[in-house]
Amino acid sequence: MSSRSHNGSVGRPLGSGPGFLGWEPVDPEAGRPRQPTQGPGLQMMAKGQPAGLSPSGPRGHSQAQEEEEEEEDEDRPGSGKPPTVSHRLGHRRALFEKRKRLSDYALIFGMFGIVVMVTETELSWGVYTKESLCSFALKCLISLSTVILLGLVILYHAREIQLFLVDNGADDWRIAMTWERVSLISLELAVCAIHPVPGHYRFTWTARLAFSLVPSAAEADVDVLLSIPMFLRLYLLARVMLLHSRIFTDASSRSIGALNRVTFNTRFVTKTLMTICPGTVLLVFSISSWIVAAWTVRVCERYHDKQEVTSNFLGAMWLISITFLSIGYGDMVPHTYCGKGVCLLTGIMGAGCTALVVAVVARKLELTKAEKHVHNFMMDTQLTKRVKNAAANVLRETWLIYKHTRLVKKPDQSRVRKHQRKFLQAIHQAQKLRTVKIEQGKVNDQANTLADLAKAQSIAYEVVSELQAQQEELEARLAALESRLDVLGASLQALPSLIAQAICPLPPPWPGPSHLTTAAQSPQSHWLPTTASDCG
């Protein structure tokens, strides 16, 4: 029986089939060869094959193709080889962009739900009722946007967990699921899930009227309790501001912050905005809070305000404004606990904003460092000029007193007393100005801020470093000069012996028996004695 019958194929040599040495054929779906089924011994034999042949593929593959396959295996997420630094950085950058995009979409759908909720609430009070089809359709739209928002929030936190794994080099996502993170995700999902559900549901709302203290009961919609908490979705705006901030996205800023142990979070971005444009931030925050609080009070007071005082939007804005400014005229008061709670939060927020406004105005009215230096220089110049004028007045009055008392035949006592009075005034003025100048100098010394001290310290450090470098260079030169002097001293010490050897060479040693034998054997070599005349 020939080898072809054993191989199961025509024209294929023995031992080259698919099952030879446990190697399987190439899987067309995966695009790579299947793993061998043999033990480690055969795998070692496959690794020891020549570089020109690929053990995992057909013969004739070049080494370049093998290297390309290895690079593809490294890029695959399921490969056993660890990813390179460039691959991790690229993956991290892509996750950053995806997280930013998800945050933008979440803010869009969150704001869309709030706008539709406000529209449905206003239309249900004046255009149609809660039982109408339009109200049901708008509530279904709110529910759809809420479901999409919840999905985006989950995807956002999934990207955050992936970023945590990339930053810390972890493989299991359960490592990142701490109790704090789980609680935060649960709270965020609960806040975003609150919305008015489709349908018409009512409850009995009891309250006590403000002026008459008469109990009041009214049938209110459940949508009121589910619509007001939807404004908590505005926290997504702070997240978008953080992710789109240039300080957060700039790699150099993040590196400097990491070196200085500064955490780039929403609090840091808010402080930065308050430093750059405090007036704009306070204005936008105050107006937004004013509008939201006024609409919330209107919704809370609608069912118990028969005279339509606080249930009117303009009346609610007036109530919120006088509460925000801590004035409290008392002409309008809320009836329900919901309205009272909103007014309480508005008063606390107004007190904080008032303090911030005072701080911002005080900072704007304060002179800058350059303006302080110019002002102090001008005041010092004026004080110096006034002191010189006072000293000149003292000398002048002294001369006039001497002139009217000694250089005239008949002194005029009234004129003398007048000049003496001016003399004393000039002395007191000079002393006072000198005291003012000393105090001005103290103020100038105290005006040196920490920035000036830090700058002076840095300048002193640079000067000391330069002096230290020059001292080290001078010490190196002195060491080199000392070594050269040592060499020169050794040369000078050896100079007399060298001169003596050059003038009077040493005589050869006295010939012994061995020298005589050598002289006898070699007649050309002879020995001449050295006389005293040769040495001079």
Swiss-Prot record:
What is an example of a Pfam family matching this protein? SK_channel
Non-traversing membrane segments, not crossing the membrane:
342-362
Please give the chief subcellular localization of this protein: membrane
Source superkingdom: Eukaryota
Q: Where are the transmembrane segments?
A: 107-127, 136-156, 224-244, 273-293, 313-333, 487-507
Localization of this protein: Membrane; Cytoplasm, Myofibril, Sarcomere, Z line
- Subunit composition and interactions: Homodimer. Heteromultimer with KCNN2 and KCNN3. The complex is composed of 4 channel subunits each of which binds to a calmodulin subunit which regulates the channel activity through calcium-binding. Interacts with calmodulin.
Q: Can you say what this protein is called? A: Small conductance calcium-activated potassium channel protein 1
Q: Which family does it belong to?
A: Belongs to the potassium channel KCNN family. KCa2.1/KCNN1 subfamily.
Domain comment in the entry: The coiled-coil domaim mediates heteromeic assembly.
User: Source species, please?
Assistant: Rattus norvegicus (Rat)
